[in-house]
Amino acid sequence: MRVNILNFLSAGFFLVFTACNIQVVDSAKRSALRYQASILVHVDPKGDGDGSHENPLGTLEQARDKVRELRLAGERRNIDVILNDGTYELEKTFILNLSDSAPEGSVTRYIAAKNSTPIISGGVNVMGWEKTDLQKENIWVAKVPWAKGNEFFHCLFDNTKLLSRAQSKKIIISNKSRVKDYAGELKYKYEFGFEDPGNNGIIRNWDNLEDIELFGMPTRKWLVNYLPIESLDMNNKEGKLAIQATYRMGGEFFVENSLDHLDTPGEWALNSKKGLLYYWPKSGKPGENIVAPRLDELIRIEGESDMSIEGLNDKPVNGIVFEGITFSYADRQKWTVDDIGLQHDWNMWDKSNGLLRFRGTKNCIVNNCTFINSGSDGVRFDLFSQNNTVQNSTFNNLGGTGILFSGYGPGLKDVNKRNKIYNNELKDVGSLFWHSPGIFIWQSGSNLISSNHIYDQGYSGLLISGVRRRFFDPIFKKMGQGYPYSRWSFPKGGRENLGAIRWDEISLESITEWSSYEPYMHARNNIIEYNEVHDCLKRLHDGNAIYLSAHGNGNIIRKNVTYNHPEGALIRTDDDSHNVAVTENICIGSKEPEAQGLCLKGLNFFENNLLFNSMLLTGSAGNTADIRSSYQKNIVYFSKKDSVFHQRLNMFSENLNKNIYYNPNIKLAENFIVEEQKGKRDTESIAADPLFVNMSEGNFSFKKKSPAIKLGINAISLEEVKKIGCTRDPWLERAIKFKGFPMVTK
């Protein structure tokens, strides 16, 4: 049965997906590499003309309206809006809707003029600074009367540098809950007690309490929250939040945005009640480019969304292209009581946030753009999203997620699919919301995520997920069934996932078998290949380079390289992750001898992978590994004498087999196999040098006498290794600059 399932994954699903992807790739080529547009509209920040080359228009809105006139008059050819050099400052979100949709087969392209770098900005320069007598006259103040309500900002930049908001010393947060599970009762996500170590007066009833936030990790260290305070009882040292925390309150927190704690050069605080911004510049005087973001989203391309299954009134915007443009300065995501959280609140569902947001779109392209210096997400595709592409772009210094594709919640509406994320560089994404991944695929399927370079992440690099079984308690109750996941109880009214589930469309034959849930999980048939993911988990814990949970069948993780991960597995299938083929990946450990390479839960197939100084293991919390899973034909190679080849694999028997284990102390590897075979595991596995052709040059083909050939292990050829990473900066070219292999940077 295992072989048939694996063949189905690697052959059947792949053939179907490849056919879909051919369509996506061809669509991208037709649009991004378009022939010269017949109609040109020119725009310049200093313009005041008619849109001609000689007399450009002055704003994006004017250019959009010009295009609308042309389309309304029947123009069906391509239209290029040419953006000249300069900064296009937005005072409100720039919206493209169905009136701006291109006819089928055509595009409307917002494109940089030749040799130009147009910048679209949601920021405003803060001027009029005056010195105060605070902190020995080191703190300056500026009037920002507009910075309240929706324009209250949560981040500030000195040109390209994200400045630190005033932050207190840590306080200890507690609650009165007797239940120790991290979800707990709803009220304990709002109510909290606090301790002030040393009685330093860290927390008090400020007159602008609505501006103050608690920052920290409620109960678990795989996420952070920014939580506005509704009220404080100083006598009893208790408080209440204005919005719920992800989990019950508890742990170390910090008070942010109080003038009381503006005590370090480089910090700032905003008092919206007085309309004053305070700042302690490191240089002694505020620079000329102190920028405050005043928008949550800079540009939104929005069709009409029909929430019904049939979607007869779904009308996506077609054929909008952005090329060669830089996007900067949106505010950090603001959470509200109406938000619906994606897994662990790692982002919010259908949220008005991001530098560039597509909501109900098809055949749209983001090509050769830069998303930089912002508190928000880079680009996100919500709800209906088909045949859209993000390629050849750079994401850097963002407070939120780099690229998000987020469909509808579990149910029968599956319309976020067949998209492409190709050849992008994502660095230092999640600088504010530390848990934000570089790429996040939620309830979105049949996508190609290929040749991206993701690194310097606060948490995980690349995620595919949906909603776990433990959230479906309302259906269990309707069925007269008890709750089988008592360790994880999620109360009614919780933010995470519940509001996105399409309850009336779901019918379960079994509340424990994943096969009953799978039809409603639309993150299926994705191909993740040739990506380079490294140096993640720089701020949080329990994260991974590539991570999967609660998705549909048929995802393929192949020919990626992952390395420099301080803890946790490089590639991990977590709770409710099934029928994933993890194959031909290169995993390089950095915490010898117990670096985690591949971590398996569920029914999955880990075959033909190369693990250097990293081990195989299974997860121990939540659902565990299915014994029908496969750990076969992998090479586990240690370059030092200390090695741990795998952990917690005792439940396996014949499906843990035909692996090669190598250690310079070959006797150690041989003894390991002898012990394994006592448990009827690794019966055909061997301890041997796999005899790569030239490991130091990245050629993992096998020499003629390699024992891997006899075991049927597939080689990863030099030609395939050269494809890994961004095409403009391939991984191997950097790797071979280091002496020896595997390459582990510092």
What spans do the regions from the language model cover?
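Bacterial N-terminal signal peptides that target proteins for export
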Residues: 1-9
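C-terminal motif of bacterial Sec signal peptides marking the signal peptidase cleavage site
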Residues: 18-19
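Extracellular polysaccharide-degrading/modifying enzymes targeting complex plant/algal/animal polysaccharides
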Residues: 42-372, 411, 472, 480-484, ...
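Predominantly extracellular beta-rich ligand-binding scaffolds that present long acidic/polar faces
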Residues: 91-99, 105-109, 580-697
